[in-house]
Structure formats: structure tokens, C-alpha cells
Amino acid sequence: MPLACGHFQRLMIARSIDAHPGVVPQRCTYDGRMVDKPQWLIREDASVSVLVALALRQLLGIRVPEDLPALRDLAVRAPDAVEASPVIEKQWHEYWDMTVEPRAHPAGVPLELIDGFDTLVALPATGAEELRAAITPFAASALRYARGAHSRYVDAMTSTTGGDAYRAYASAIAEFEREVGRRAHSFELNVQVLPFSQRGIWWIGALSVAVSDGLRRDVVAFDSAIRPVIAELA
């Protein structure tokens, strides 16, 4: 089934074990007839919200998550700059979790949109005052960076995959099924393709990974890198 998810702004792939791989429209839900059959759902994106959160992390000098590298083409705080306070770091991490996997990390209080970030940043109405004050001066630069990075992802995926972006995932699942001798269990995976300064793939949530854009464009290397992720979930 050909890809039909215009401009790759969000790639959503699903499979019933009796169907060919294909793209699920952004608001599509599974057909009730497939409820009892194993199926998988993969969403690939370079989410502007995720990019904004990481840009703010870098601009504020926040170190968590410690294993995530810096973003390319975005200023890194000077070594002698004052580090973010533990309070801001904690509040940012909670905001990060809500951004990456909002269903798994619901806010305990109402959320409020932050001025200057359009609808891309929402923080708890109470308990995030320090973070709110810290990020406000960086709104314009973080938004500009995130939107530019997202546009480059869209252009790159359109030009390099030729409409076959799903094949890397389908191949990894098929190889997993051959190795273990069974169908893959039903699972969900979110993939964020990001302009990291280091090449690799990192878990950023229970059902979410971040992959460097350079690795994603390398068909052979990405196929090898995504297989352990598929095996973990399937």
C-alpha cells in the first residue's frame, strides 16, 4: 500500500497480520474487526513541540536526560555559564515527559499555554513558575529553531524515501518474526527524528525513541538500529 500521509508531517503506519503495511490517517482508529488480531502502530515525526522542549533544554543549560546529545546548529551555553537550578531542571523534566508521552504523564493540575510559544508549550498552572519565567526570553529563538528543523525533516524524508518510509519498519518487524518464529505482538512506537550532534538512537519514553536524522537517512544503519527497539516491544 503506498504512503498517503502528505509531506510526511506525521508518518503513521499500522498493520493487521492479514493486511499489507500502510499508512493510517492521522485521526484514524482501528477497525473493530481487527480487535482480536495482532497489529502494530508506528508514528514517525520531528515534532515541533519536542524540538521546542529540547531547544529550551539546551538554551537553559539543563543536563537531563544526561544521555541525550545536544542539538546541531543551536547555541550551547558557555562552560562558565550558571547552570540551571535543580528546581528548573525538575520542572523542565516534568514538562518534557508530558510533551513526549502526554497520555502516560498527565498533569495533576490544569495546563496553561505560555505566551510567545503559540500552542506549543503548556505548563501546569501551579508548580512551574520558575520554568515559565526562565523559558519566556527564549520563545522566539526556540520556535524559530524548532520550525526550521521540522521543515528540514519534512524535506529530507520526502526526497530520500521516495514514498517508502514505512519499509524500514516493515523490514525490521519481518526480520524479528523470522528470528523468533512467531508473529510480532501488538505494539505502539513513537519515533522522533531529531537533528542531534551525535549519531544514534535513544529511548525517551516507554513507547518512544529519538533517532538522529543522519542515522534515519542511512537505510542500512537505521535498519540495524531499529531492530532491537522492535524486539523490545514486539
Label the model's feature ranges.
Residues K90, E129, R167-A170, A174, ...:
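Generic alpha-helical secondary structure signal
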Residues Y145-V209:
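Auxiliary, metal-adjacent structural segments of Zn-dependent hydrolase domains
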Residues A210-F222:
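Extended, well-ordered protein cores
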Residues V219-A234:
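Active-site recognition of the HExxH zinc-binding catalytic motif
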